[in-house]
């Protein structure tokens, strides 16, 4: 890794969740990500701070945006990137997560990016391996890089985060994105609201500093930012809503519901989008939508995270760069 003096204070060697970061940590990562945007669009051999580093992506859950984003982020930084094909791996033959991690650790990677259906999987690996761990989503627990890219998208669109009213709508119960965003947005000074049917709200959400509403009309009043969440039917074992049609009418984002928010509000969605379920196509593709911008910001954010973690590890180990 080449000399990098951009991170004077970033004490973390893993990114397991937003809960582990303070406001200064968030600002450092967002500032670096913002600086990375010009370099996130193509490989620049003159800007290769991760040259000679190895990044392994270990996705136990299907992913398009997040896995591709991490692959591109590593390559933009000059890292050697390997994505493990879980479908053909020893995991399918009964190998445990710990055994897989131990095997990969023997290969001496510098970064291990993991997505897993079990909450705490990334934290468990961090105790077992010698490299930097990045949580790319663990069950319904956290998705820290998604929260960071959402914050960067908001800040670039609105010029600030502090003082904004951000409304998170939809399947909050099953959403790791919601949890990470609540933590980051509260820390950065936003006013956070949640709108969902009571069956899709986690217990104790109000204790996280969130204003809770059960109607879009009330919840979207004065909204600067609307963040729609996918209805995660694959995680549902019971009937949480009467019907898709009724859910879209009352809790989907269509013209009538959007009219309750500020006229200049922006719309976010972590993807994948279920058109006609949580958001109408004309809204998802409309001028207020920042969905494609979020994807673009994701590469810059993940570049910043990898740089920061490796820089911190090298400083802690006393290695000469």
From Swiss-Prot:
Cysteine disulfide partners in this protein: none
Listed transmembrane segments: none
One example of a Gene Ontology biological process annotation: amino acid metabolic process
Residues the entry annotates as binding L-aspartate: 93, 176, 230
Biological role: Catalyzes the condensation of carbamoyl phosphate and aspartate to form carbamoyl aspartate and inorganic phosphate, the committed step in the de novo pyrimidine nucleotide biosynthesis pathway.
NCBIfam families: asp_carb_tr (TIGR00670), PRK00856.1 (NF002032)
Name listed for the protein in its UniProt record: Aspartate carbamoyltransferase catalytic subunit
Organism listed in the record: Bartonella quintana (strain Toulouse)
